[in-house]
């Protein structure tokens, strides 16, 4: 830090001032680098580095105290995997400068309050954990920490608040105990027993209706799928029974015990959990993912049991590493494989399990799906001799458990596995999965293999996929993705509209205009009625069929050719698809043409929605139509539906944002007018108020359309599921068919993937669709969803 003390020779005042500013910035950057990098690989020991850094920071406190405070609060929040390193550093600084220690504690409490107010509950957990570990470093007095935890657990006694609020405060308390439980029990055992008793009482009366919706597997063998608070409570109970002996947390402060025990401690200021408000959004509950146990790696170090607190600590630290470095896959992979204490645990098994736990987390993974694919690829490159084998073992386990796996997680498994294979020349021992060849094609295993090969084809080409799998798998291979043109062979001569199709083909090739196409279509007879209207464009399925079939056939060369065709003849599409029936029929014909090319179907539907040829409700009705019944359980169908819902949601959000911006602009103009007597602003206000009124109408119309879309989707789900249940009851057969599992879990998927939007329409859904008279099997899904934020 000697840069600050350099003397500068200069003749003028201004250059000297500029150099001082530059020098201060350099020093601040250097401090940031030192603080962020402490604990990384170094020639010196961690203890030596911490002692040296504490000395540097102490020397810089007079000039850079606020910067140092801010940096330490930030790393406490953003680098939780290095928690004990930073608590030790704060402990050393507190021992040297008591006032700084007090200011740091106050700053942390302020930051905790801000995080809770801003609904940053994940960061708030790390701040609470950091504060609790400061007890071990003799910065915070144990009784005041116990008092804070008493206030946390008192939230369980609150009335008329969501369960997820109570859950968070209990979790914040329990998840800190692996670090500080021993110290708190030694100092305040009676108070801690009282807190434990309150916690246990709460956990026993908690509702767990939400659990089935969040489980990766419906079966508890070989590993139970436990609710996260139940699992953590069992781990803490075992830790308490073992006299708080924990062997995995890095505790560098133990090396400085003689220094830290002499330091004066601070009492936490009284902390009252902020009250629940309408704007409070708490973390959703989770189910703990388990894939491995000690039997899966008999030769290596023993994997801690599921109720061992070491399992919690290891998983928590690995999750924290991913959270800190997920945007840099190479750095993230390097940090994971260099995890401290890696020789004491089967690290590769833990890493793979944690990554799949995040990928399969419901309702959504913490990060985008493709990040996990790229991270696993990097890990395979870093550990080529060991990690690919563990990953292959995990893949085999997932395949074996497909029968009870959530459909949403199966989708993610398909997407991950196909993408992963594409990076390794699609090599896989397919013969090991030949058991799927003897099963019904709708069963989970053959269905999974079929969908994987379909996705692989998107990342390669059809013939290559045929070449990489054994001939015995041919029934599961995707069809050749070619266009099916019904007017293309001699046998089609007798088909209605054949002659018009020939005329259209010539016209398209001759670069005909929209008007010329209208002229050709004008005389196409309408099979639905004797007399057409004057314009000749009332819903006419034959017109749509001839036009769409011929145009898509001629534009079949590529995606861009098809897009150009839609754009050029947009006016014809809009006219033919003017009615709801017309929109539905356009989708049906497009599907007939591209039945063997799911990717083309998906991109064409996407384009038709964007260009307003069809609307979102038409797509939903088409997906539930009889024409798609054979493909109803195919993955591409549900990708289209979710994409459609997302488009609708984005459309509503876009208009809402425009409305908010207009209102803010008007408020600014009002403020300016009150500050400055400007009469011309009256005219501006009038124009803006008109714009706000128009936007308000657009928002209401868009929300009505959005609500209608969800009503259509849920109504169709209820209809087809009810038909299935009634049919099974009439026939005396089991309802638990592969189709039923897929369908009921697709219903769950809609709720989960769009939960934030659907929450707005809960009352409408409950009053109109999910009523008490509904079959309990279907109603249970709605009740599980309601329980997620209850």
UniProtKB/Swiss-Prot annotation:
Biological processes annotated in GO: 7-methylguanosine mRNA capping; alternative mRNA splicing, via spliceosome; cap-dependent translational initiation; defense response to virus; histone mRNA metabolic process; miRNA-mediated post-transcriptional gene silencing; mRNA 3'-end processing; mRNA export from nucleus
Alphabetical keyword list: Acetylation, Coiled coil, Cytoplasm, Isopeptide bond, mRNA capping, mRNA processing, mRNA splicing, mRNA transport, Nonsense-mediated mRNA decay, Nucleus, Phosphoprotein, RNA-mediated gene silencing, Translation regulation, Transport, Ubl conjugation
Limits of the MIF4G domain: 28-240
Alphabetized GO MF terms: RNA 7-methylguanosine cap binding
InterPro entries (UniProt xref): ARM-type_fold, CBP80, MIF4G-like_typ-1, MIF4G-like_typ-2, MIF4G-like_typ-3
Modified residues (Phosphoserine): 7, 22, 201
Principal place of residence: nucleus
UniProt keyword Nucleus present: yes
Record-listed N6-acetyllysine modification sites: 204, 698
Phosphothreonine: residues bearing it: 21
Cross-link (Glycyl lysine isopeptide (Lys-Gly) (interchain with G-Cter in SUMO2)): 684
Subcellular location: Nucleus; Cytoplasm
SUPFAM superfamilies: ARM repeat (SSF48371)
Tissue expression remark: Expressed in the spermatogonia, spermatocytes and granular cells within the cerebellum.
Keyword Transit peptide carried by entry: no
Region (Disordered): 1-26, 666-685
Subunit structure: Component of the nuclear cap-binding complex (CBC), a heterodimer composed of NCBP1/CBP80 and NCBP2/CBP20 that interacts with m7GpppG-capped RNA. Found in a U snRNA export complex containing PHAX/RNUXA, NCBP1/CBP80, NCBP2/CBP20, RAN, XPO1 and m7G-capped RNA. Identified in a IGF2BP1-dependent mRNP granule complex containing untranslated mRNAs. Interacts with PHAX/RNUXA, SRRT/ARS2, EIF4G2, IGF2BP1, HNRNPF, HNRNPH1, KIAA0427/CTIF, PARN, DROSHA, UPF1 and ALYREF/THOC4. May interact with EIF4G1; the interaction is however controversial.
Family: Belongs to the NCBP1 family.
Protein name: Nuclear cap-binding protein subunit 1
Species lineage: Eukaryota, Metazoa, Chordata, Craniata, Vertebrata
Encoding gene per record: Ncbp1
